Each structure stands twice: as C-alpha cells, then as structure tokens.
UniProtKB/Swiss-Prot annotation:
Keywords noted in UniProt: Amino-acid biosynthesis, Arginine biosynthesis, ATP-binding, Cytoplasm, Ligase, Nucleotide-binding
EC number annotated for this UniProt entry: 6.3.4.5
Subunit structure: Homotetramer.
List of residues binding L-aspartate: T132, N136, D137
Organism ancestry: Bacteria, Pseudomonadati, Pseudomonadota, Gammaproteobacteria, Alteromonadales
Protein name as annotated: Argininosuccinate synthase
Organism per entry: Shewanella pealeana (strain ATCC 700345 / ANG-SQ1)
Similarity annotation: Belongs to the argininosuccinate synthase family. Type 1 subfamily.
GO cellular component assignments: cytoplasm
Molecular function terms, GO-annotated: argininosuccinate synthase activity; ATP binding
Positions annotated to bind ATP: A20, Y21, S22, G23, G24, L25, D26, T27, S28, A48, G130
One Pfam family named in its UniProt record: Arginosuc_syn_C
Gene name as annotated: argG
Length: 412
C-alpha cells in the first residue's frame, strides 16, 4: 500500500476534478486554469450550502458553467452542519485559545466529506481547493481528504500557479473573456456559514487599527444596540436547543433565530490574534451571535448538572478537542473518542435558561434542570437541618493531612 503524498506534483493522470467552488474570483479563475494545466480535464464544480446566505448562492450554477465547468452540484449541508458537527463540538466545551468558537474550523470537515462524496459519484480522480499556501484551511481540507479518500489526487492551485494578486486573477479571466463581478478593490477576506462570519485582511492586518463599522455584517455595534434588554427563553434536551421562546425548532432554524435576535443586540463579536496551525499569527474579527448565546446556555446548564470532577474532565477534553478541530483532525480516532466520551455528559444537559441580551452581552439570568445537582437546602446559610457544619472538621483535617505532614517534616 502506498502512503505517498497524494498532492499533485506533475500534471499527468488527471481526467476529472471536483473543485470546491464558491463563485468568487479565486475559484472562477481556477476552472480555466485547471483545464489549461491538466490537459483539458473535465471540471465538476461543487458548492456546499453551509448557511452562507442566499446572496452567495444566487446564480452560482450558471457562473460555474460559464467559467468552464461541466456540472455544478450545490449540496445543502446546513442542518447536518449544526446537528452533527457544531453541537457535538460545543458539547465538549471546545473553544480555541479561550475565545474562538471555531466557526470556520467546524465547517471544513463536512465540506470536505461532501466534496469526496461528489467525487465518488462522478468518478473523479482528483479534488481541488482554492485555499492559499499560508492559511489553515489547506491543511484542514487535505487532512480530511487523506482520511476519507487517500487515493484521490489533490490539486492546490495557489501552491502552483504564478498569480499572486487579485489584479493577476482579473487579468487572467479578462484574457479568456470570462465575466466576473469581482473587482481589484476587495477590502476584506470573509468566510461565512450558519455559525459565524470571519473577517480578515485590509486594515485588520495591523493590530493597532480598530475595526471600522464596515467590518461587521452580522451584528450591530453594541453602542447602537437597543437601550432596553431583550430576554430569550431556551429549552435544552441532551445538550441541544429544541425550543426558542417556546417554539420548537430544528437545530439549524434555532441557530438562525438566535443569530437574528442576538445580532440585533451586538452579541458575539471578538477581535483576536490567533496562532495559526502553519506557524504564524493572524488577526481575525469574528461574529458568532447565535453561537455565543447557545454556548452560554449549555455552560449554564452544565453548572447545574455536572459534578466537580466531571466539569474538570470536560474542560480538559474541550481544550484538546479545540485543537483537533482547529488543526483539521476531525476524521481521526482521537476526535471520535473525545466526541463519544463526551456524549454521556451532554445527555445530562436538559433544562431551561433565560438569556438577557443587552449592548453586546449575553447573560444567563435564569436556569433550571430536572438533572440539577444544586440543592437550596444544602447551599443555604440558614439552619443546619440537612448539613451539619461540624462534619466539615474531619473532612478538612483529612484534606489537609499532606500539608500538615509536609510542614512537620520541614520542622525537623
């Protein structure tokens, strides 16, 4: 069995390629480039609908065909993304470097998996992505391809072609009479899905520059948000939100409702400088309005239902899971093990929370659960009917025994 790198190093033996296609400038240029570079091979465009919005998908099929693709598959992955990737991940408590809710990272495995499925369906011998050679996504996609379809060749044009700028791409398309609505003045690099939108590039490359209001698209500025708070009631079953304000909703639709209501109150903005997998630091501005509310709701119920040791273990799992997801290692035995081990704890996360939305903040102000370990009788500072404070004396003596022995030893 060969374990050689499947990335294409020469331009032979490629007859049909499935391209992860967005309709943007990069992937519009990739289609003719593939045909020219790989001996007029057939190009099948694939677009994953992960909730990036109707505007991003409008006219996509026609655009792909006009650019030279023989077919374009647009696959609806929205519900699957939220139910099978986002919820299992946040159930582990995964949050990268303490702030990033992994919006881009969680979407890459499902996109890669669907791309492989299309490749199998059409009998392709290669897959192609438009990720740059400086970013994390090239590793995420190709790591998934290696795990799911090691026989498929992988083409990464940004690591092959000589074009280095948007102007180069525009000139390339113009020379081939391929129409595009893109311009050379694009300010930000954005990536959107149902969970979040990321913003990079432009003025954001200097961390001394405050993001302008034009950066943000999913949320209003907190200072411009309503002067009155809004309260949202959420019901949870086995770690998933099933109702918003009493209305039963699917995982994806619940997220969409929360995106709208939380975004209107400026909730979910972060501006971070993160450590990329490839070794450099990068600045990113992220908006995750609904996800921020969901994450807070789950953590609030966990506070009620998980004992101390379980919470400590879940925090350790969350830290490791965050790195696995960020680093593109979803389809690995370790990731599968962490997800499976976390499920019994997630199954305890049942109950109801009320979240207060106000000026950029999402605060859980009410919470209850049928699985709650909290007992008002035990926690009260009143009479000792159920908790005899004298019992603490023996516990403290045993708990501090090692410290006592160490101190006595040092006095000898």
């Amino acid at each position: 069995m060969s374990i050689e790198n499947s990335a294409v190093s020469d331009h032979s033996g490629v007859n049909k390629v499935v391209l992860a296609y967005s309709g943007g400038l990069d992937t519009s240029a990739i289609i003719p480039w593939l045909k020219e570079t790989y001996d007029n091979c057939e190009i099948v465009a694939f677009c994953a609908d992960v909730g990036q919005g109707d505007a991003e998908l409008e006219g996509l099929y026609e655009k792909a065909i006009a650019s030279g693709a023989s077919e374009c598959y647009i696959v609806d992955l929205k519900e699957e993304l939220v139910a099978d990737y986002i919820y299992p991940t946040i159930a582990t408590g995964a949050i990268y470097e303490g702030t990033y809710l992994l919006g881009t990272s969680m979407a890459r495995p499902i996109i890669a998996k669907a791309q492989v499925e299309v490749a199998r369906k059409v009998g392709a011998d290669a897959v192609c992505h438009g990720c740059t050679g400086k970013g994390n996504d090239q590793v995420r996609f190709e790591g998934c391809f290696a795990a799911l379809a090691p026989d498929l060749k992988v083409i990464a044009p940004w690591r092959e072609w000589e074009m280095v700028s948007r102007e180069d791409l525009l000139d390339y398309l113009a020379e081939r009479n391929i129409a595009t609505a893109a311009s050379a003045t694009k300010i930000y690099s954005r990536d959107a899905n149902a969970w979040h939108i990321s913003h990079e590039g432009g003025e954001l490359e200097d961390p001394w520059n405050e993001p302008s209001k034009g950066v943000w698209t999913m949320t209003v500025a907190p200072e411009d948000a309503p002067n009155q708070p809004e309260y949202v009631s959420l019901e949870l079953e086995q770690g998933k939100i099933t109702k918003v304000n009493g209305e039963a909703l699917s995982p994806y639709k619940a997220l969409m409702v929360l995106n709208e209501v939380a975004g209107a109150h400026g909730v979910g903005r972060i501006d971070i400088t993160e450590n990329r997998l490839v070794g450099m630091k990068s600045r990113g501005c992220y908006e995750t309005p609904g996800g921020t509310v969901m994450f807070a709701a789950l953590r609030a119920i966990e506070e009620l239902v998980l004992d101390k040791t379980s919470r400590e273990w879940r925090e350790q799992v969350g830290a490791q899971m965050a790195h696995l997801v960020y680093d593109g290692r979803w389809f690995t035995p370790l990731c599968e093990s962490l997800l499976g081990a976390s499920k019994p704890l997630a199954d305890l996360v049942n109950g109801e929370v009320v979240v207060k939305l106000y000026k950029g903040q999402a605060s859980v102000v009410k919470k209850r659960s049928p699985n709650s370990l909290y007992s008002e009788e035990f926690a009260t500072f009143g009479a000792d009917d159920v908790y005899n404070q004298k019992d603490a004396e023996g516990f403290i003596r045993l708990y501090s025994l090692s410290s006592r022995i160490r101190a006595l030893h040092s006095q000898k």
